[in-house]
UniProtKB/Swiss-Prot annotation:
Cellular compartments annotated: Cytoplasm
PROSITE patterns given in the database record: RADICAL_SAM
Radical SAM core domain span: 80-298
One Pfam family it belongs to: Radical_SAM
Family note: Belongs to the radical SAM superfamily. Lipoyl synthase family.
Cofactor section: [4Fe-4S] cluster
The protein's name in its UniProt record: Lipoyl synthase
CDD domains assigned: Radical_SAM
Underlying gene: lipA
InterPro entries noted in UniProt: Aldolase_TIM, Elp3/MiaA/NifB-like_rSAM, LIAS_N, Lipoyl_synth, rSAM
This protein's UniProt keywords: 4Fe-4S, Cytoplasm, Iron, Iron-sulfur, Metal-binding, S-adenosyl-L-methionine, Transferase
Length: 322
C-alpha cells in the first residue's frame, strides 16, 4: 500500500496533481472532446490594459491576491478595467480540492498578520466604494479564518470613507459554523455571501468535503443573528444538473431566508477539471431570473458570464446584471 504524498507548506498543486487527490476520478478531457464555446460566451477585451496593469501592480506591491486571477475568471479584463476587484485573503492555497475550481490546493502558509491592514490601505488608495472579500478554504484554522475576515472588514472601514460597502464571500466554515457566526455578527459586512455552487445530487462529484444542508444552514443562521444584513448565494449551471433541480435549490435558498442569488455558466479551467456537460442558452438564464423574482429574491443576476462578484456593486444596488 502506497503512502500518501506529503506536500510541503506553500507548495501549490494544480490541474492533474490536484485532481489526483479527490475521491471521485476525473478523466482528463481530450481536446477534441471539449465542447466548443458558443458565441454568447465570447469576452470582449478592453482597448487599453493600463487600468488592469495598475490594479495588478497595486496588489503585487502589497502581497495581495485577487480571486479574479487565481480562479481564472473570464470577467477579469472588464472588472479590472473598471477599477473593481475581488480580493482573496488568507493566501492563495486552498485546503479543499473542488474539481470545478482553478485555485491551487495544498498546505497553506500561516495567515499574514499584516494582511488586513495592507488590504485596507490598498482599497483606500484604489478609491473604490464597493469591495468583495473572499478566501480560500482554511480547514487548518480553528475558526476557519473567520477572525481574519472580521479584521479585514474592520481595517477596510477604518481606512476608507464611511460610504464604502463590503461584501464577503465566505467558505462553509466546516465544523466551525457557530464560532464563525459569533465572530462575524460583531464585525458584519453589508452582504454575507456563501455559494452553494451546484445541486445536491452533484455535490460528491463537484464539492467533495462540502455538505449541501450545512451550507444552507450557514446562510440561514447568519440571517437569524443579523437580520439587517443581506444574504446571498451563487450557482453554476452546465455541470449536468436539470432545470428542475436548479429551481428546487432556488426554493431551498428562499426557504432559508437568502435574499440575493447569482447564476452563471460553469467553464472548465483545464482538461483535468470536471467537464462542461452543456452550455446553457441565455434564454434559459432569463427564465431562471424570472422564476427567482417570482420566488421573492430581492435581486437575482442570471447570465452566462455572471459570477458572484461580477458587478457586485450593481447587484447590491438592485440593478440588472446579466
Amino acid at each position: 500500500m502506497s503512502k500518501p504524498v506529503r506536500v510541503e507548506p506553500g507548495v501549490k498543486m494544480r490541474d492533474a496533481d490536484k485532481m489526483a487527490l479527490i475521491p471521485v476520478q476525473i478523466i482528463p478531457t481530450e481536446r477534441d472532446q471539449m465542447l466548443r464555446k458558443p458565441s454568447w460566451l465570447k469576452v470582449k477585451l478592453p482597448s487599453s490594459t493600463e487600468r488592469i496593469d495598475e490594479i495588478k501592480q497595486a496588489m503585487r506591491s502589497h502581497g495581495l491576491h485577487s480571486v479574479c486571477e487565481e480562479a481564472s475568471c473570464p470577467n477579469l479584463p472588464e472588472c479590472f478595467n473598471h477599477g473593481t476587484a475581488s480580493f482573496m485573503i488568507l493566501g492563495d492555497i486552498c485546503t479543499r480540492r473542488c474539481p470545478f475550481c482553478d485555485v491551487a490546493h495544498g498546505r497553506p502558509l500561516p495567515p499574514d498578520p499584516e494582511e488586513a491592514e495592507k488590504l485596507g490601505k490598498t482599497i483606500r488608495d484604489m478609491k473604490v466604494k464597493y469591495v468583495v472579500i473572499t478566501s480560500v478554504d482554511r480547514d487548518d484554522l480553528r475558526d476557519g479564518g473567520a477572525q481574519h475576515f472580521a479584521d479585514c472588514i474592520r481595517e477596510i472601514r477604518e481606512h476608507s470613507e464611511n460610504n464604502i460597502q463590503v461584501e464577503v464571500l465566505v467558505p462553509d466554515f466546516r465544523g466551525r459554523m457557530q464560532v464563525a457566526i459569533d465572530i462575524l455578527k460583531g464585525e458584519a459586512p453589508d452582504v454575507f455571501n456563501h455559494n452553494l455552487e451546484t445541486v445536491p445530487r452533484l455535490y460528491k462529484a463537484a464539492r467533495p468535503g462540502a455538505n449541501y444542508q450545512w451550507s444552507l444552514d450557514l446562510l440561514q443562521k447568519y440571517k437569524e443573528v443579523r437580520p439587517d444584513i443581506r444574504t446571498k448565494s451563487g450557482l453554476m449551471v452546465g455541470l449536468g444538473e436539470t432545470k428542475e433541480e436548479i429551481l428546487e435549490v432556488m426554493k431551498d435558498l428562499r426557504a432559508h431566508d437568502v435574499d440575493m442569488l447569482t447564476i452563471g455558466q460553469y467553464l472548465q479551467p483545464s482538461r483535468h477539471h470536471i467537464p462542461v456537460a452543456r452550455y446553457v442558452h441565455p434564454d434559459e438564464f432569463e427564465e431562471l431570473r424570472v422564476a427567482g423574482v417570482e420566488m421573492g429574491f430581492s435581486h437575482i443576476a442570471s447570465g452566462p458570464l455572471v459570477r458572484s462578484s461580477y458587478h457586485a456593486d450593481l447587484q447590491a444596488a438592485g440593478e440588472t446584471v446579466r
